[in-house]
Amino acid sequence: MTLENRSTCLMTCQSSLLPKKPRFLSQKMWAPHLVVAYLIFVTLALALPGTQTRFSQEPADQTVVAGHRAVLPCVLLNYSGIVQWTKDGLALGMGQGLKAWPRYRVVGSADAGQYNLEITDAELSDDASYECQATEAALRSRRAKLTVLIPPEDTRIDGGPVILLQAGTPYNLTCRAFNAKPAATIIWFRDGTQQEGAVTSTELLKDGKRETTISQLLIQPTDLDIGRVFTCRSMNEAIPNGKETSIELDVHHPPTVTLSIEPQTVLEGERVIFTCQATANPEILGYRWAKGGFLIEDAHESRYETNVDYSFFTEPVSCEVYNKVGSTNVSTLVNVHFAPRIVVYPKPTTTDIGSDVTLTCVWVGNPPLTLTWTKKDSNMVLSNSNQLLLKSVTQADAGTYTCRAIVPRIGVAEREVPLYVNGPPIISSEAVQFAVRGDGGKVECFIGSTPPPDRIAWAWKENFLEVGTLERYTVERTNSGSGVLSTLTINNVMEADFQTHYNCTAWNSFGPGTAIIQLEEREVLPVGIIAGATIGAGILLVFSFAALVFFLYRRRKGSRKDVTLRKLDIKVETVNREPLTMHSDREDDTTSISTATRVMKAIYSSFKDDVDLKQDLHCDTIETREEYEMKDPTNGYYNVRAHEDRPSSRAVLYADYRAPGPTRFDGRPSSRLSHSSGYAQLNTYSRAPASDYGTEPTPSGPSAPGGTDTTSQLSYENYEKFNSHPFPGAAGYPTYRLGYPQAPPSGLERTPYEAYDPIGKYATATRFSYTSQHSDYGQRFQQRMQTHV
């Protein structure tokens, strides 16, 4: 519909609605009707599309946190009149600035129809219902609810910041979150770990909008809670992250005690240290020690030291620590290893034949013991428990039983208990007894059974006697703990007494018991025979001891024939090396002969039938320990001295083996290594004519064969060049030459280095020495000095 049509319609409608003017009415009567018609026209005009006033945006429900800004929208179309806001039905005023409400104002463009209500710094009082009204258009928006959220004003735990508690006493931790809207939610934390089980309640304030939340958490404080932190977190929609407050616990508790032993396992009598380690809040006031429930008067510290016995295994040692809150007592037993100790003693038992008997014996020991029951004089184990059960006993079961306890590697103990079985007397004397002819003799009759005999009588030949004297015979009765002894004493025993049988009969309430005893003669050795045997045994013992001493002496003497080295640090050797090609006959002897005795035999083989080499070459060895203690005045330094007298040394001299002629062969090599001292002793002889060796040097001291004043030093090294000399006293032998060539006697000229005829089988014996087996003797003309350290 166009505007022209719309105007035409309006005019038509208006004319149709107006009453027709009667011709007889005046103009004043038509005036009210014109006003009504006008209003109807305006209303219809506004109702038509494109021309009516309406809300394009109305306020909606909102939530705002106290202190924040809130805007309620209101937008009108086709309206240019007055707009106002109401709060819970109360008009706030007109215009943009609402002077009565400083935090309120209408914002937006009026040309655009925007009449928004802005609230700054929202408060609890702003929590209401709001409405936008177009007064001239008689329009009202929907009601919008503005909800103001208020966080808890304060969160507090009662009793903080430090709460003093008693260990073991339950306590409720209480947290309060005040004046929150909506009511706050409370969560508990213990050292950062969320706790469950809290009980929560709320209280509504007088304004009817805010609430206070109360939460209680039940705890059981212990000494481990000292310093523990509990946190209360309160939150609502106004503060999602919440507010927190914390408290710390201070728990008073009696001492917490740990009792230790060092060492933990001990033997009886050893020392033990008890240590009482304790923690307490408040501080410890003192210590008390007790053993087996009895106070130890002189122990007041945290350590107690004592020597333990077996009682510490069964009687605990206790340590009591106390403070203002209370005291704590801790006890412990000591693992004491001890020998068996009896707890229940076995009791002697008397019973009748056919009864059952139980013997009891209780021991204690540590480590666990082994218990055995045996009968005296028997090794058969009858039981391994504390009790020995004997069923249907007879008189044969009577006797002494042994209860033995064994603690491995610690000790053994035992107790004996007798068992008496009532019955007729049992005589336990020997059936054959002895006496000496002419002396006083005794025949004994012992009854160890129970009950004791009422009567004991002796009968022999035609004689009968219970007690008293009859001619040479006397009967006596003696009571002891083990039984009754009746003794028949015979004065001046005769031959007829050995031909008689003696009847001993005893009676008690259970009947009689009889034994037949034979008396036999005991032969006595004369005193002279006994004395002679004793003396002979003593003499034999003396001779045996002397033989043993002599044997040990000879054995020790024989063991001193070895040669020992007194100095082990330095040795000097002078070794000649000869080509084996010059003396082919020496090859077989190089490794087979190495002792001093064989060397002497090689040199003096012609005298071996007349001289006892074993005696002449006796070596007196000084013990190794003494040799080590001897000191070298040169501190191990060795000298090789030429053209000087040979120093006095412990050497075997060979003067007895040489003929005292002007020219003699000296069997000793020029280089001598003392195998007793370890020092090198070298004498260098010049290559002089044969006359230079006309006499033998006088020995430095007497040297008898087998002498004990020196230690023989037998050095048989290959020696240096000597002049040739005929062997004294043996003209028939070929000339014996060693070493470098010398001027030969007439008729024996040879070229230099020409081989000479050997003397006998052992011509190469002088090549052997006490040097190492690996020494090289293959080169004749190469001389070397060896130093061994």
UniProtKB/Swiss-Prot annotation:
Residues 48-531 are extracellular. Residues 553-789 are cytoplasmic. Residues 694-712 have a biased composition (Low complexity). The keyword ATP-binding does not apply. It comes from the Eukaryota. InterPro entries: CD80_C2-set, Cell_adhesion_signaling, Ig-like_dom, Ig-like_dom_sf, Ig-like_fold, Ig_I-set, Ig_sub, Ig_sub2. Disulfide bonds join C74-C132, C175-C232, C276-C319, C361-C403, C445-C504. The modification Phosphotyrosine is found at Y637, Y638, Y654, Y657, Y756. Residues 1-47 form the signal peptide. Interacts with TJP1/ZO-1 and with NPHS2/podocin (via the C-terminus). Interacts with NPHS1/nephrin (via the Ig-like domains); this interaction is dependent on KIRREL1 glycosylation. Homodimer (via the Ig-like domains). Interacts when tyrosine-phosphorylated with GRB2. This is Kin of IRRE-like protein 1. It comes from Rattus norvegicus (Rat).
